């Protein structure tokens, strides 16, 4: 594997820490008035999402991870695995529940996703930023039954539950922000 010095470490770079891929979220090069320079960095493990802060000497090296982000299309789920296809090469890969990283509740089929591959194996799936899903179950909203802004839970066709405004009804299609899991708009 390739290694890079601490002078070449940048935000967004993917590295290996204890044989696990991580992405650097923050770096700060510190040169104190007395003593040796060092780099303080924060990184997030791709698989678990755990964030760790580490300080390293300027002479240390880090190992670059063989991690590739690939645009792929979600095809289907067979209950145990989720299947994706590269639209250019038609190569198919599958991942389990751990590799989905919570993206499974936003995918119904034929969505374009970013799949992170490590040594050819999917370890993380990023769904599209916005998805349009149909509401399968929600209570009818009655005007005046709230003391604040109001909202009600709605179950979507994928099984996800989001809070929606009172004017949204069952069988309507809504736009959901997958990054926050919040209602965005009603689709006409």
UniProtKB/Swiss-Prot annotation:
Where does the record place it? Cytoplasm
Q: Which domain of life is it from?
A: Bacteria
Mainly resides where? cytoplasm
* PTM comment, free text: May be beta-lysylated on the epsilon-amino group of Lys-34 by the combined action of EpmA and EpmB, and then hydroxylated on the C5 position of the same residue by EpmC (if this protein is present). Lysylation is critical for the stimulatory effect of EF-P on peptide-bond formation. The lysylation moiety may extend toward the peptidyltransferase center and stabilize the terminal 3-CCA end of the tRNA. Hydroxylation of the C5 position on Lys-34 may allow additional potential stabilizing hydrogen-bond interactions with the P-tRNA.
Q: Which GO terms describe its cellular component?
A: cytoplasm
Its function?
Answer: Involved in peptide bond synthesis. Alleviates ribosome stalling that occurs when 3 or more consecutive Pro residues or the sequence PPG is present in a protein, possibly by augmenting the peptidyl transferase activity of the ribosome. Modification of Lys-34 is required for alleviation.
In its UniProt entry, what is this protein called?
A: Elongation factor P
